[in-house]
Amino acid sequence: CGHATLATAHCLKAHLNYPNEDICFKTKSGTLNVCFKNGLYELNLPNRVGKPAALPGEIANALNIQPKEVYKARDYLLVYQSQTEIETLKIERSIFDQINIDPGGVIVTAVGKDSDFVSRFFTPQASILEDPVTGSSHCTLIPYWFKRLQKKELKAKQLSKRGGDIGCIYKGSRVQINGAA
């Protein structure tokens, strides 16, 4: 995921004294370039624009709060009314794990109180139900929030137990995420 790529870049820079500002990773999903600028690690990725979709019954039945909008790209994107709904959202794992959306997951999002938007990311049938910080989910989140808020530069917060702040830039067919180590 994007967050792990940024963490790997940080390890190379901070602990192995990698001399360049740009680091190129060859991955199964293609080449990922990380740039270190102004104390932040930046990663440029292709966007994944979601299309309106029906919510699968297994997902709907697993949620304690139903979304107001549903989109599908690689992941399902569930849009909620408020940050409070995202914070209090619970998933009944035994029901949620009945759906197979491999390699995707479920993103839940809403307008943030102290950021442009907040999110959480869940993966059925995975060893960890909720990912702490998910760079790849922002490939879908950034185009959605760009269109809704009409802002190219966005501040995001992932509300998992560990959580994280993500800088986001909409670049047409691509998105850029950045964060500190």
Language-model regions: role of each:
Residues C1, L6-A181:
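Active-site proximal loop and beta-alpha junction motif in alpha/beta enzyme cores
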